[in-house]
Amino acid sequence: QICYDLRFPVWARNQWKDGEAAYDLLFYVASWPAARVFAWDALLPARAIENLSYAIGVNRVGIDGNQIAYTGHSAAYDFKGERLVDLGEKDQIQVVTLSRSSLEEYRSKFPAWKDADPFTLDS
């Protein structure tokens, strides 16, 4: 998903069929300014928790041509909302290994998806 999409949980909602999730990883590429980094830091782990999936967010670092500051905070979270990687304000690359078996084990022990109400969005 892209940038501002992080604010809309329904767009990221994992869909389940016969106990299988549509995805195991949410990935956000973003340009969130420093003024809103608190929301970025709160919403990214929330999406991981509510969708029983990993969530990775890559956010911009630096100052743009309009003098707007971007502080990064690129991070990876597991399905429990625990931070696996936090790059803070650094402009760098880091590798993270995600465990599918840990994810599947957690989903089987905590099958919250079974309680989700199916719904559709009308245009």
Can you say where each PLM-predicted feature lies in the sequence?
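Residue-level signal for alpha-helical context at structural boundaries
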Residues: 44, 98-99, 114, 121
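A short, polar/proline- and glycine-enriched secondary-structure boundary/capping micro-motif
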Residues: 9-11, 96-97, 116-117
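CN hydrolase (nitrilase-like) catalytic-core segments centered on the catalytic cysteine
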Residues: 6-93
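A short, polar/charged loop-to-alpha-helix boundary motif
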Residues: 92-109
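Cysteine/selenocysteine-centered motifs that mediate thiol-based redox chemistry or coordinate metal-sulfur cofactors
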Residues: 17, 36, 104-123
